[in-house]
Amino acid sequence: MKKLIATLLLGAGLAFAGLSATAQTTTEAPPAAAVVAPAAEAPAVTAPAAEAPAAAPAAAAPAEAPAAAEAAPAPTPNKGDTAWMMVSTLLVVFMTIPGLALFYGGLVRSKNMLSVLMQVMVVFSLIVVLWVVYGYSLAFTEGNAFIGSFDRLFLAGVWDNTAGTFANAATFSKGVVIPEIVFAAFQATFAGITCALIVGAFAERMKFSAVLLFTAIWFTFSYAPIAHMVWFWMGPDAYSSADVAGDMTAKAGYIWQMGALDFAGGTVVHINAAVAGLVGAYMVGKRIGYGKESMAPHSLTLTMVGASLLWVGWFGFNAGSALEANGFAALAFINTLVATAAAVLAWCIGEALHKGKASMLGAASGAVAGLVAITPAAGNVGVGGALIIGFIAGFACLWGVSGLKKMLGADDSLDVFGVHGVGGIVGALLTGVFSAGSLGGVKGDDYSIASQLL
């Protein structure tokens, strides 16, 4: 138990340090605030008094004042956006079950395959339940800069029985919303796959009950607060004028306030999970026979199938993070395709140069490396930037699972830190570079690469 507590505390601390490294040092209001001009008040128009007809024996009754302008109707979710988000949610589930489960299952020894499959599936299921109970509320409601509140326990308030309407969640476009219940489901899958990723770091040597206990505690004290700090904000409609921009930004999560860019979870998902997995591997210790016995994957066929399912599902993961079926979703979609392909080629080239030939395991690992690296950048960089990020990530993660792994000395069973940690860090840093408009990114002329990297 002491090791478990130490693991959680150290893991959360390192993850927070990693997040802070990607944050912008100067507070920057969300882009929506920069383009919203203060609403001009319409000048009051006074209708001239009607003159009484000359023949009228008495003055006419005064004309009634114009009716007050009706308040603007609340935005209505677009059916296309809603359908896209439900499909994206399904794709992320597909990434985990069976994608990640098969990817991990093929990498372990045959005697441990069913154990890993069960851990991935049950961990995902546990987190979905905890997300509905309290996780969503802690991550995506207004509280303070580090954690949300309990306003949405058991998703309370997403349905108004009296009015017969669903609550809406903001997107990144002013006046565009999606049903909050769809947003909650989408984010539940992110939380679930993040916790399932950690399983690979200490696979083949941890009791099932201990895995579930660790997962529940880590989710509560690490994932939910970090998701709030990086992703929670008040939405573009809250920035009704420049006068309130500062107040609205102050209500956002701590890392969001600092201007960090994380489109789909490079820090929240990958660096966060990788640090937890690395610390867990240190604390649990090495597998019996590690370094002495062969621990080669038992089925690269399953690993190939799992990697392919991850690639397909990742389109929902990245493009769905736009929260709308729009141009940014399309940009994230093609960047996910391009960066992954580039990383596969880079890993194979690096492996051929290092070992004399490429391998199926290398190609599958390269695909995951590219997917991880493009995650924080997907909707922020141009296609050229995605190509470069993929190539760099392929080589960097190959080093992460070989040279860096030996330097760290931890038995990270399935190279969670080497792929997700290194890939996440590379992606987070290069997002700061290639988001610049001059390099094909979506940021304007006032964007500073240096401040983002710092």
Where would I find each of the regions flagged by the language model?
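Short, intrinsically disordered low-complexity segments
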Residues: 1-2, 151
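Soluble extramembrane regions of membrane proteins in the secretory/endomembrane system
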Residues: 2-70
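Glycine- and aromatic-enriched membrane alpha-helices
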Residues: 47-48, 52-454
